[in-house]
Amino acid sequence: TYEMNAKRQHEVPVIGEKEKFFGRDDYSEEEAAQLLHLGKLASQTKNCMNCHTLLGNGAYYAPDLTKAWLDPAWQAEGSMQALTGKSTKEEAMAEFLQHPSQYPTHSRMMPNLGITAEEAKGLVAFLKHMSSIDTNGFPRNFGKIQGAVNGK
């Protein structure tokens, strides 16, 4: 999560308790590093930045992925878990990445890039990791604009 830091005048990441990721909370450092490496490699081989932005780099055609893990749409009360029928944020994100054409969310549809289940798991881990970086308030007002789903 993020909370407002009055001194810095923007929201900063708050690292919470250990939580399960794809049903596990016992990843070794080596396993976690391999998963992150797979996700970064998948983001490069699938050319995610041809459409998306990450840390200010890339294109502006599709949503900014810098804090995708924290996007309210993926939270338990958000629309994407219900839309995908998955019970956790990471499962919903992985399902969407593997079958984007089944879940129309914006006026611009994400193409099916042939992302495998393992690549999707790595991509979700990579996006979760990226969301934990203190970006000094960038992107501004992230997650506060309501009604961005379904092209509204």
Protein language model regions, located:
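Extracytoplasmic electron-transfer domains, predominantly the class I c-type cytochrome c fold
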Residues: E30-H37, A42-T45, L55-N136, G151
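Short cysteine clusters
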Residues: C48-C51
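Post-cleavage N-terminal segment of exported redox proteins
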Residues: T1-A33, F126-K152
